Amino acid sequence: MTGKEDNDACVLHDKSLKLVLKSRSIVIAGEITKDVSRLFQEKILLLEALDFKKPIFVYIDSEGGDIDAGFAIFNMIRFVKPKVFTVGVGLVASAAALIFLAAKLENRFSLPFARYLLHQPLSGFKGVATDIEIYTNELNKVKKELNNIISKETGQKISKIEKDTDRDFWLDSSAAKKYGLVFEVVETKYQLEEFISA
Protein backbone atom coordinates (compact mmCIF):
# COMPACT_ATOMS: atom_id res chain seq x y z
CA MET A 1 0.00 0.00 0.00
CA THR A 2 1.11 3.55 -0.72
CA GLY A 3 1.02 6.28 1.91
CA LYS A 4 -2.17 7.65 0.36
CA GLU A 5 -3.84 4.22 0.35
CA ASP A 6 -2.90 3.74 4.01
CA ASN A 7 -4.35 7.15 4.84
CA ASP A 8 -7.54 6.43 2.86
CA ALA A 9 -7.94 3.11 4.68
CA CYS A 10 -7.54 4.84 8.06
CA VAL A 11 -10.09 7.52 7.14
CA LEU A 12 -12.54 4.83 5.97
CA HIS A 13 -11.99 2.86 9.20
CA ASP A 14 -12.57 6.00 11.30
CA LYS A 15 -15.80 6.80 9.42
CA SER A 16 -16.95 3.20 9.76
CA LEU A 17 -16.21 3.19 13.49
CA LYS A 18 -18.06 6.49 13.98
CA LEU A 19 -21.09 5.01 12.22
CA VAL A 20 -20.93 1.91 14.46
CA LEU A 21 -20.79 4.09 17.57
CA LYS A 22 -23.61 6.37 16.43
CA SER A 23 -25.99 3.65 15.20
CA ARG A 24 -24.94 0.98 17.73
CA SER A 25 -25.01 -1.39 14.77
CA ILE A 26 -22.53 -4.06 13.68
CA VAL A 27 -22.67 -5.66 10.23
CA ILE A 28 -21.47 -9.22 9.67
CA ALA A 29 -21.11 -9.72 5.92
CA GLY A 30 -19.21 -12.31 3.90
CA GLU A 31 -17.17 -15.19 5.26
CA ILE A 32 -16.85 -15.52 9.03
CA THR A 33 -13.16 -15.69 9.89
CA LYS A 34 -11.00 -15.19 12.98
CA ASP A 35 -10.43 -11.58 11.87
CA VAL A 36 -14.17 -10.95 11.50
CA SER A 37 -14.70 -12.44 14.97
CA ARG A 38 -11.94 -10.30 16.51
CA LEU A 39 -13.30 -7.09 14.98
CA PHE A 40 -16.82 -7.98 16.09
CA GLN A 41 -15.66 -8.59 19.67
CA GLU A 42 -13.81 -5.26 19.75
CA LYS A 43 -16.88 -3.38 18.48
CA ILE A 44 -19.42 -5.02 20.78
CA LEU A 45 -17.22 -4.51 23.85
CA LEU A 46 -16.71 -0.87 22.87
CA LEU A 47 -20.46 -0.35 22.49
CA GLU A 48 -21.04 -1.99 25.86
CA ALA A 49 -18.44 0.24 27.51
CA LEU A 50 -20.00 3.39 26.02
CA ASP A 51 -23.54 2.60 27.20
CA PHE A 52 -24.57 -0.82 28.49
CA LYS A 53 -28.23 0.24 28.78
CA LYS A 54 -28.76 0.87 25.07
CA PRO A 55 -29.40 -2.04 22.67
CA ILE A 56 -27.01 -3.24 19.98
CA PHE A 57 -28.10 -4.30 16.48
CA VAL A 58 -26.29 -7.03 14.54
CA TYR A 59 -27.12 -7.20 10.82
CA ILE A 60 -26.18 -10.50 9.16
CA ASP A 61 -25.56 -11.35 5.50
CA SER A 62 -23.07 -14.21 5.53
CA GLU A 63 -22.47 -17.60 3.95
CA GLY A 64 -20.92 -18.79 7.23
CA GLY A 65 -17.33 -19.86 7.70
CA ASP A 66 -15.11 -20.78 10.64
CA ILE A 67 -17.37 -22.43 13.22
CA ASP A 68 -15.03 -21.55 16.10
CA ALA A 69 -15.13 -17.89 15.06
CA GLY A 70 -18.92 -18.23 14.92
CA PHE A 71 -19.03 -19.63 18.44
CA ALA A 72 -16.81 -16.78 19.67
CA ILE A 73 -19.26 -14.20 18.27
CA PHE A 74 -22.21 -16.20 19.67
CA ASN A 75 -20.55 -16.22 23.11
CA MET A 76 -19.86 -12.47 23.04
CA ILE A 77 -23.44 -11.59 22.08
CA ARG A 78 -24.62 -13.54 25.12
CA PHE A 79 -21.81 -12.24 27.35
CA VAL A 80 -22.34 -8.48 27.05
CA LYS A 81 -24.85 -6.56 29.17
CA PRO A 82 -26.77 -4.70 26.43
CA LYS A 83 -29.78 -6.32 24.79
CA VAL A 84 -28.69 -7.55 21.35
CA PHE A 85 -31.01 -7.72 18.33
CA THR A 86 -30.04 -9.83 15.31
CA VAL A 87 -31.45 -9.02 11.88
CA GLY A 88 -31.14 -11.35 8.88
CA VAL A 89 -30.72 -9.14 5.82
CA GLY A 90 -29.54 -11.57 3.12
CA LEU A 91 -28.01 -15.01 3.40
CA VAL A 92 -27.79 -16.33 6.97
CA ALA A 93 -26.05 -19.67 6.56
CA SER A 94 -24.17 -22.19 8.67
CA ALA A 95 -22.05 -20.38 11.31
CA ALA A 96 -23.99 -17.18 10.54
CA ALA A 97 -27.22 -18.95 11.54
CA LEU A 98 -25.56 -19.86 14.85
CA ILE A 99 -24.69 -16.19 15.40
CA PHE A 100 -28.25 -15.17 14.49
CA LEU A 101 -29.56 -17.51 17.22
CA ALA A 102 -27.43 -15.83 19.91
CA ALA A 103 -30.20 -13.26 20.43
CA LYS A 104 -33.35 -14.23 22.32
CA LEU A 105 -36.28 -15.20 20.08
CA GLU A 106 -38.11 -11.90 20.64
CA ASN A 107 -34.94 -10.09 19.51
CA ARG A 108 -34.50 -11.96 16.20
CA PHE A 109 -35.83 -10.27 13.07
CA SER A 110 -35.65 -10.87 9.34
CA LEU A 111 -35.99 -8.75 6.25
CA PRO A 112 -38.42 -10.24 3.68
CA PHE A 113 -35.98 -11.81 1.22
CA ALA A 114 -33.42 -13.11 3.69
CA ARG A 115 -32.69 -16.85 3.41
CA TYR A 116 -31.54 -19.21 6.13
CA LEU A 117 -29.44 -22.36 5.82
CA LEU A 118 -28.98 -24.93 8.58
CA HIS A 119 -26.66 -27.89 8.13
CA GLN A 120 -24.06 -29.96 9.91
CA PRO A 121 -20.55 -28.52 10.23
CA LEU A 122 -18.44 -29.07 7.13
CA SER A 123 -15.00 -30.64 7.09
CA GLY A 124 -12.19 -30.44 4.60
CA PHE A 125 -9.72 -32.06 6.98
CA LYS A 126 -7.03 -34.34 5.54
CA GLY A 127 -4.38 -36.32 7.34
CA VAL A 128 -3.41 -39.71 8.73
CA ALA A 129 -6.17 -42.07 9.85
CA THR A 130 -5.73 -41.48 13.60
CA ASP A 131 -5.82 -37.69 13.18
CA ILE A 132 -8.91 -37.98 10.98
CA GLU A 133 -10.59 -40.09 13.67
CA ILE A 134 -9.78 -37.52 16.37
CA TYR A 135 -11.02 -34.69 14.15
CA THR A 136 -14.22 -36.61 13.27
CA ASN A 137 -14.97 -37.15 16.97
CA GLU A 138 -14.52 -33.43 17.62
CA LEU A 139 -16.70 -32.55 14.63
CA ASN A 140 -19.45 -34.83 15.98
CA LYS A 141 -19.29 -32.98 19.33
CA VAL A 142 -19.66 -29.65 17.52
CA LYS A 143 -22.58 -31.04 15.49
CA LYS A 144 -24.30 -32.12 18.71
CA GLU A 145 -23.72 -28.71 20.32
CA LEU A 146 -25.12 -26.93 17.26
CA ASN A 147 -28.20 -29.16 17.13
CA ASN A 148 -28.84 -28.60 20.85
CA ILE A 149 -28.62 -24.82 20.41
CA ILE A 150 -30.94 -24.85 17.39
CA SER A 151 -33.43 -27.08 19.23
CA LYS A 152 -33.40 -24.92 22.36
CA GLU A 153 -33.70 -21.63 20.46
CA THR A 154 -36.42 -22.73 18.02
CA GLY A 155 -38.45 -25.03 20.25
CA GLN A 156 -38.14 -27.84 17.69
CA LYS A 157 -37.52 -31.39 18.91
CA ILE A 158 -33.90 -32.50 18.77
CA SER A 159 -34.88 -35.46 16.54
CA LYS A 160 -36.33 -33.04 13.97
CA ILE A 161 -33.25 -30.81 14.12
CA GLU A 162 -30.95 -33.81 13.63
CA LYS A 163 -32.97 -34.89 10.58
CA ASP A 164 -33.22 -31.37 9.12
CA THR A 165 -29.54 -30.52 9.55
CA ASP A 166 -28.26 -33.83 8.20
CA ARG A 167 -28.35 -32.15 4.78
CA ASP A 168 -28.70 -28.54 3.64
CA PHE A 169 -31.97 -27.23 5.08
CA TRP A 170 -33.15 -23.98 3.48
CA LEU A 171 -35.81 -21.62 4.81
CA ASP A 172 -37.13 -18.34 3.47
CA SER A 173 -38.04 -15.62 5.97
CA SER A 174 -41.65 -16.74 6.50
CA ALA A 175 -40.62 -20.41 6.89
CA ALA A 176 -37.90 -19.32 9.33
CA LYS A 177 -40.55 -17.55 11.40
CA LYS A 178 -42.75 -20.67 11.48
CA TYR A 179 -39.71 -22.78 12.39
CA GLY A 180 -38.87 -20.56 15.37
CA LEU A 181 -35.65 -19.08 14.00
CA VAL A 182 -37.17 -15.65 13.43
CA PHE A 183 -39.54 -13.72 15.70
CA GLU A 184 -40.91 -11.37 13.06
CA VAL A 185 -40.35 -10.38 9.44
CA VAL A 186 -40.04 -6.61 8.97
CA GLU A 187 -39.69 -4.51 5.85
CA THR A 188 -38.50 -1.20 7.34
CA LYS A 189 -36.48 0.18 10.22
CA TYR A 190 -39.69 1.84 11.43
CA GLN A 191 -41.37 -1.56 11.78
CA LEU A 192 -38.35 -2.91 13.65
CA GLU A 193 -38.43 0.06 16.03
CA GLU A 194 -42.17 -0.44 16.63
CA PHE A 195 -41.59 -4.04 17.73
CA ILE A 196 -38.69 -3.02 19.94
CA SER A 197 -40.60 -0.23 21.66
CA ALA A 198 -43.82 -2.27 22.11
From Swiss-Prot:
The UniProt record lists the keyword Protein biosynthesis: no
Residue numbers annotated as active site: S94 (nucleophile), H119
E.C. designation(s): 3.4.21.92
Superkingdom as given in the UniProt entry: Bacteria
Keyword Protease attached: yes
SUPFAM superfamilies given in the database record: ClpP/crotonase (SSF52096)
Main location (coarse class): cytoplasm
One Gene Ontology molecular-function label: ATP-dependent peptidase activity
Keyword vocabulary terms for this entry: Cytoplasm, Hydrolase, Protease, Serine protease
PROSITE patterns: CLP_PROTEASE_HIS
Gene3D superfamilies registered for this protein in UniProt: 2-enoyl-CoA Hydratase, Chain A, domain 1
Record localization: Cytoplasm
One Gene Ontology cellular component annotation held by this UniProt entry: endopeptidase Clp complex
Assembly notes: Fourteen ClpP subunits assemble into 2 heptameric rings which stack back to back to give a disk-like structure with a central cavity, resembling the structure of eukaryotic proteasomes.
Task performed by this protein: Cleaves peptides in various proteins in a process that requires ATP hydrolysis. Has a chymotrypsin-like activity. Plays a major role in the degradation of misfolded proteins.
Family: Belongs to the peptidase S14 family.
HAMAP family xref list: ClpP
Protein name (record): ATP-dependent Clp protease proteolytic subunit 2
Source organism of the structure: Borreliella burgdorferi (strain ATCC 35210 / DSM 4680 / CIP 102532 / B31) (Borrelia burgdorferi)
Lineage: Bacteria, Pseudomonadati, Spirochaetota, Spirochaetia, Spirochaetales
